[in-house]
Amino acid sequence: MNILVFNGSPKKQRSDTLHLSRAFLDGMCEAAPQEIHAIDVIDRHIEFCRGCFACKYNGSHCVLDDDMREILGQILASDLLLFSYPLYCYGMPAMLKNLVDRMLPLSSMAMEDVNGRYVHVGQRDFSRLRYLRRHRTIRRRVGRCLFRHLRHENFSIYLQ
């Protein structure tokens, strides 16, 4: 499995959140061989989305010439996306939110009903990423783990 990790912490490799994500990845590697690629988002040049929607009309190519072109290619080649980030002001850090906003070329303007919710249809087939939906609860559980006074606790129960 090809795993792409987005490290959204400004602390880069010293991030407590990344430490916990590494434990998750180590467990995945014990179960089966994995190919892991990590991106420190703070080190990448990613401009802000202009909202021009040119990517919707020119074959999903963004008009901005920055590192997102390479990152979008890596996303398309991945089987699993892991977003590792600390919670700042109840959400992800701005640099990671910017990266998520720039994933707009991967969706289309078309909408479809999925379990009573309308969502944008992808411009490409992302069916192999369905694995993420089953692990949605990991985010909630892991998010509660990183309080300073709990830093040295054993979190392996949350990763099972």
Protein language model features and the residues they cover:
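Conserved beta-strand scaffold positions in the cores of enzyme catalytic domains, especially
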Residues: 5, 36-38, 126, 154-157
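Short, glycine-/small-residue-rich phosphate/pyrophosphate-handling segment
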Residues: 110-156
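N-terminal beta1-alpha1-beta2 submodule of the flavodoxin-like/Rossmannoid cofactor-binding fold
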Residues: 1-108
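Cofactor-binding loop segments of dinucleotide-utilizing enzymes, especially the Rossmann-like FAD-
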Residues: 8, 41, 129-133, 159
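Glycine-rich phosphate/pyrophosphate-binding loop and the adjoining helix
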Residues: 1, 12, 26, 30-31, ...
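Repeat-unit-sized solenoid/scaffold elements
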Residues: 64-81, 118-119, 147-160
